[in-house]
Amino acid sequence: QTMGIFRQNNCASAALPDLISHEDWKLVLMECKMCPRDATKWSVQVGFFDGEITSKVLPIHQACALMAPREVIETLVKCYPQGIKMKESAFHRTALHIACQTNAPIETIEALVHFYPEATRIQDALGRLPIHYACAHEVPSSTLELLLREFPESCKIGDQNGWLPLHVACRRGVSLYELELLLDCYPQSANTLTDKGSSPLMCAQKGNSRHHEEMVQYLEDYIKRSEQNEKDLLSFDTWEPARKLSTIHHRNVAAKG
C-alpha cells in the first residue's frame, strides 16, 4: 500500500494532529512545548493509506507520512519516547516503515534509526521491512545505505509473498548503484524466486521505470558472471584432486626407481 493525502481526523480535541495535517511545523513544535502529552494521543485518520484506508495513528506516524523535518520528529520522540515503537492499526507499521514509504528526508530516517534501530528489523502485517518500502519508492542511495548498514540481514528476508527487497527494487526501479548494494549484501538473491516463481530479472523485465533497460542488462550480466564463476570453481575442484593424485603417482614411481 502507498501513502495518500489523508482527510481531516475525527477527533475534535486533537489539536496536534490538526496542526500536523496542515504541515504547520512551527506551530507543531510550539504545541509540543506547551502540551507534550499531545504526542501520546492516538487519533483516527480517515484515508491515511491511499486516501482510502483508515488507521489509528500517533502524531509521529502522521508526521512521518507528511515528511516532517528532523526537528519535528526528534521533538515528538522526546515528548513520547515509546511512540517510535508503536504501530499504526491498519498495517501495523512503525514510524520508520511510514517514513520509508513516503520517501522522507534522509535526516528524518537517520533520526528514527538513531532513536529506535530495532525498527529496521520489524515486519508489518504484510511481512515487509522498512527496506521493502525504501526499495519501492526510489529513496536516495544514502537511505538504502543506512538501512543496510544497520541491518544487513534484511536483504535475505521476504515478505508474505516471498518478495525480497531485491525483487521490489527490480520491479519498481532503482539506480545501478543501489542494485549493486542489494546484490553485494546478498549475492544469492539474484536467483531467488518469489512464491509465484518470479526472479529479480523477471521483475525487472516487467518494470517500466527510467532504470528499466540498464537494470535488465546488469542483471543478465551479473547472472552470467555468477554462472561462469561456479563453472570455474567446479573445474578447479575437479582438476585439483587429479593434480594431487598425479603428483603422488610420480613420487611413488620415483621412489621405486
Where are these regions (language model features)?
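Ankyrin-repeat boundary/linker signal
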Residues: W42-Q45, E52, K87-S89, I122-Q123, ...
